[in-house]
Amino acid sequence: MADKGDQSSYLIKFISTAPVAATIWLTITAGILIEFNRFFPDLLFHPLP
C-alpha cells in the first residue's frame, strides 16, 4: 500500500492538473464550434418546419 504522503502528492497533482486540462479541452471545443459556425453559419440552428 502507498503511504499517506504519496496519496496526498497525487491529490495535489490532480487538483492542479484537472483545471488546466479542462480549460484546454473547453478552448479546443469552443474553437471547433466557432470555426464550424464560420464555415457553415446556418447548420447549428435547425429551423422548425
From Swiss-Prot:
Lineage, top-rank taxon, reads: Bacteria
Q: How does it sit in the membrane?
A: Single-pass membrane protein
Instruction: Recite the UniProt keywords alphabetically.
Output: Membrane, Photosynthesis, Photosystem I, Thylakoid, Transmembrane, Transmembrane helix
According to the UniProt record, one GO cellular component term is: plasma membrane-derived thylakoid membrane
Gene behind this chain?
Answer: psaJ
Which family does the similarity line name?
Answer: Belongs to the PsaJ family.
User: Which cell locations does it reside in?
Assistant: Cellular thylakoid membrane
GO BP annotations, alphabetical order = photosynthesis
| InterPro entries found in the cross-reference section | PSI_PsaJ, PSI_PsaJ_sf
The identity of this protein, by name, is Photosystem I reaction center subunit IX
Enumerate the PANTHER family for this protein: PHOTOSYSTEM I REACTION CENTER SUBUNIT IX, PTHR36082
- Function (record text): May help in the organization of the PsaE and PsaF subunits.
What SUPFAM superfamilies does the entry give? Subunit IX of photosystem I reaction centre, PsaJ (SSF81544)
Q: Does the keyword Magnesium apply?
A: no
Its transmembrane ranges are 14-34
